[in-house]
Design a protein with these regions (language model features):
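A short, structured active-site edge motif that brings together acidic residues
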Residues: 70-81, 165-170
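Beta/alpha (TIM)-barrel catalytic core signal, keyed to glycine-rich beta->alpha loops juxtaposed to Asp/Glu
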Residues: 117-308
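Short, well-ordered coil/turn segments that N-cap beta-strands
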Residues: 11-16, 40-42, 68-72, 102-106, ...
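Active-site-adjacent beta->alpha loops and helix N-cap segments on the catalytic face
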Residues: 53-57, 115-122
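Short, acidic/polar
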Residues: 24-36, 85-100, 149-153
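N-terminal binding-site loop/beta-alpha segment at the start of enzyme catalytic domains
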Residues: 1-72, 131
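Active-site mouth loops of central-metabolism enzymes
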Residues: 17-27, 77-87, 111, 116
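Active-site groove signature of glycoside hydrolases
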Residues: 97-118
């Protein structure tokens, strides 16, 4: 495992984050979680909307049975559309903590934004929860750069704690259309520049473009893989895919691991969210952390230069 540091989080944070959203029951989930921890993983991503709180309850049961809460970094998310209000963020957090059988989460994200709500109202609620010790560092998931900056401007003007973490999409493939309604990518140059200059940590979801860098991403399979085609099929992405395949062959690894390495090689703190369904998938993801890229390889993969 490899780790990163986030100001305000006491523990080093595993850069491969285990998503708690693809497991149906504890019998399926516990072996995945156990193996992840045994391989050095310590960061788990939860959200109130996953299975309408069912995934939180499952993970809360796991925490109660294993006693590992103090050894991990716990991410919570709440206030997903259509309940994206400051009041919902507060009430859903209490529901989440009860389900997770803990008194705080280490990292908290508003799962969506609501542009109809003045950004300061979100900051006020999160700052209060932070001061009460219910949440550690906090930020937004699927937030625009304009609103993210506005949140921090408000926090600075009013002596409040600001947003220090972000969870938007970032992948080697450009997200052509949102995977789900309200999804936002951090891939545009202005977002990337802000992340580097501000020191904001990014927790990237769909960091390998949801299968685009496997055989499922081949353009000939557009009809049967319509979800991949909808969000990722574009000529520039096909060229990125071809380059990932070529570099994977040269390095003796897989295109998926090359795509993951691209996300983790950014010049700012990145953490990749992973939602494996099987032990084999989880282990491949962790093994892929050993793949490294030079700056020139990273830029070549992203079509910024002609040679790696």
């Amino acid at each position: 495992m490899i780790y990163g540091t986030i100001p305000g989080v006491a523990k080093p944070v595993a850069r491969m984050v285990m998503g708690v959203d693809n497991q149906d029951d504890l019998a399926q989930a516990a072996p995945l979680f156990d193996d992840y921890i045994e391989r050095g993983g310590n960061c788990f991503d939860t959200a109130r909307i996953y299975m309408r709180g069912g995934c939180e309850a499952l993970f809360g049961e796991y925490l109660a049975k294993t006693g590992v809460r103090d050894n991990i970094v716990l991410i919570g998310k709440g206030a997903h559309t259509p309940n994206c209000t400051p009041e919902a963020a507060q009430s859903q957090l209490e529901q989440s903590l009860e389900a997770l059988r803990t008194d705080r989460v280490d990292i908290y994200f508003l799962h969506r934004d609501n542009a109809q709500v003045p950004v300061g109202e979100f900051v006020d609620v999160l700052d209060a929860l932070h001061r009460k010790g219910r949440i550690g560092v906090f930020g937004g998931s699927n937030w625009s750069l304009e609103r993210f900056r506005a949140a921090n401007d408000y926090a600075r003007r009013n002596g409040k704690t600001g947003f220090t973490v972000l969870s938007n999409n970032l992948a080697l493939a450009r997200m052509v259309e949102p995977v789900w309604a309200g999804c936002v990518s951090a891939r545009d140059p202005e977002w990337l520049r802000h992340l580097e200059e501000s020191g904001t940590a990014l927790f990237a979801w769909s960091s390998t473009a949801r299968g685009f860098f496997t055989e499922r991403g081949d353009p000939s399979r557009a009809a049967e893989e319509s979800e991949i085609a909808h969000s990722w099929h574009a000529e520039d992405n096909f060229e990125r895919r071809r380059r990932a395949i070529a570099l994977a062959e040269a390095k003796g690894t897989s295109p998926v691991q090359i795509a993951m390495a691209w996300v983790l090689s950014q010049p700012f703190a990145t953490f990749a969210l992973s939602g494996p369904r099987t032990l084999d998938e989880s282990r491949r993801n962790i093994e892929g952390l050993s793949v490294t890229l030079t700056d020139s390889e990273r830029d070549w993969l992203d079509l910024k230069r002609d040679q790696p």
